[in-house]
């Protein structure tokens, strides 16, 4: 074989890579309606809003903060806020496990949506991969919006992004917050799962 003529195996590899890369295109961006928080005036009309207004009137110039340092108390408070919400629930979490606590809280969100509460859930795709089916089912509900934070271009080919865009590997969404009726919130260091709420077996 003369020099300068590519070996047939090399040509085959180049052709195969070209075909594979041609298939690596992103799906079209879906048109979604704009989602906004409820106005402060509307939030004040909810039971949570009334309760907060009463406390603010009783303690002018101050804000209310309560430390939730017990795991079980934190889960009870999260559940109570979800059940008390009448208009909106906004949640952002880095990790959401598919265990008892995680499943119970997802069920509470679905129940809230059935009451007519608009639920918006943002989770990090790295910490929720085992929940794909559950999150897809929730997102199909007319009152629930589920969004995944994922800095990679291709969700099912992360290894390719790890190799070609390693700087994105550590871009994660570490928020941990639940906001009810745009008025009361629980935030801190706890993700959603049995190990965070003291309900692990053993």
Regions found by a protein language model. Name each.
Residues 1-202:
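N-terminal localization/anchoring segments of enzymes in phospholipid and broader phosphate metabolism
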């Amino acid at each position: 074989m003369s020099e300068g003529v590519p070996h047939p195996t090399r040509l085959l590899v180049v052709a195969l890579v070209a075909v594979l890369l041609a298939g690596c295109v992103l799906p079209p961006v879906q048109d979604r309606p704009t989602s906004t928080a409820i106005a402060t005036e509307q939030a004040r009309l909810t039971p949570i809003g009334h309760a907060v207004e009463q406390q603010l009137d009783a303690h002018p110039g101050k804000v209310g903060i309560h430390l939730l340092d017990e795991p079980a108390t934190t889960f009870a408070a999260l559940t109570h806020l979800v059940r008390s919400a009448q208009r909106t629930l906004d949640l952002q979490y880095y990790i959401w496990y598919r265990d008892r606590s995680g499943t119970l809280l997802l069920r509470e969100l679905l129940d809230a949506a059935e009451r007519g509460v608009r639920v918006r859930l943002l989770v990090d795709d790295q910490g929720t991969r085992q929940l794909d089916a559950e999150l897809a089912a929730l997102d199909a509900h007319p009152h629930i919006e589920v969004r995944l934070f994922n800095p990679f271009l291709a969700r099912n080919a992360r290894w390719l992004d790890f190799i070609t865009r390693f700087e994105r590997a550590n871009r994660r969404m570490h928020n941990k917050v639940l906001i009810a009726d745009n008025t009361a919130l629980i935030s801190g260091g706890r993700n959603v799962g049995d190990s965070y709420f003291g309900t692990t077996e053993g």
